[in-house]
């Protein structure tokens, strides 16, 4: 949520910042700005409402420099206006600041320290930059003023600060919001996500909470707030720079939908040996085997992936498994079992709702595993154990390949745990074969995109609402399919347990209401079919998606074969593609839906 970038050294700062901001746009895109300084007495501050493209159009060749900071915003405090866009500048025009996070005591700080300062924005960030300037006016150096300010602020932040009087130095600080330093040759960069600076360097230092960093072109000095020096290791981020490009696809979302078969195969290759045996870290296996109950904690799409994973852990490994929304769990923790193990599912690894749970359960002494796509992320670093989704960067705001990768990895872990415990159910489940069926089945469905486009047109072109129904994992996938449609096409969509419709919600069914029914569970297929009939009898336009062995000739889509427990790996491809085409046909920006951001770093 919000992306920040910075650069200092021998680079064309404007271009480095702009390109970085374009790649961070997934974190927020309601306004953007940058400040550059040529270290020879000239500087520029440019801010615009709207996308990075709008900012870019506002720049000409005079806006150049060798150091600077940039920001793309997802509004928290104050509407998306030019005044509220970052960088914020102190009234004496000495300090320039970009911020990702939320300062929770901004109002109190303003009342206590800034009574005589006129604020020009509604943001918490402006309070911080004015406070730094006010402290500097008392004779403190920029660094000490920043240090003292950090001692006063409460909340989350990744800050990058420029002191116009000393443009050979860039200051950054971090608490609860992600921030990395990228190491270059006579330059250094700052970024919320390594992805944004991969064209500059592949060597990154992930900062930790409480770090205050002083950067010059050739030095990186990291201290804690009390001035104690700390050394943080640099990691090489192995990512093909091209992974972050759209290539021939019109939208990242379509590219990422199309990548799913490859992601399935890559996951199998990553977590199995030549004999097809699952290989997970021994320490993780020991931890998992202590669990008398697993608690999967996640948000949004990742929560939906957890709902699909829970029955796998129960059936294959015999471990009772609960799935919880992170935003609820942290503040209303249920009574835990005697030996809980926590699994955090997260595409970004930065979700604040999840992190607050991680911090709490770690303090309670419970073992933790993070499954995420971003190896350098906070949740990956802070949990006891970490497994990568290895899905490659997911840029579109609507999550697709991370969801299917999460389910596939849950299946691999559940199988490994069941096998380690000698369970027959695990022995009978050939997960490697099933994931290979998933990959080929996904490919088949992707090749039927035209059919799904036509279905999307027929069902959703003009509708204001829609329903997705199913039972068991079909209910879980209904929630995810509805979320996909909602977030990128703004259709009011509901995922519903098929059997619950008749208990009230069926009252919403009218002539032509679109209802997609998922039928992959042999146990309940007949019941779900009856529920689909019931809505059709009340005028609904029903689209049935049925498993290979349950399909009837008049079902609109028949799935390729797969174990019913993994059917969401196929059914969701239909959901994703229908949502994609609906958004496209309605003329929306598929990758950047309104009001959203990909990395949700505020509670
Ligand atoms: C929807 C989507 C979100 C995220 C949610 C949690 O397409 O991506 O619902 O799943 O914000 O984010 P992560 O998975 O990064 O923890």
PLM segments and residue spans:
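Conserved short alpha-helical segments that host acidic/polar catalytic motifs at enzyme active sites
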Residues: 1-246, 250, 262-269, 273-292, ...
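Glycine-rich, anion-gripping cofactor-binding loops and their flanking helix/strand elements
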Residues: 180-202, 206, 327-361, 500-534, ...
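Glycine-rich oxoanion-binding loops at beta->alpha junctions
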Residues: 66, 70-83, 271-286, 309-345, ...
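Acidic/histidine-rich
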Residues: 153-187, 460-487, 522, 529
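Structural motif
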Residues: 67, 95, 293-295, 341, ...
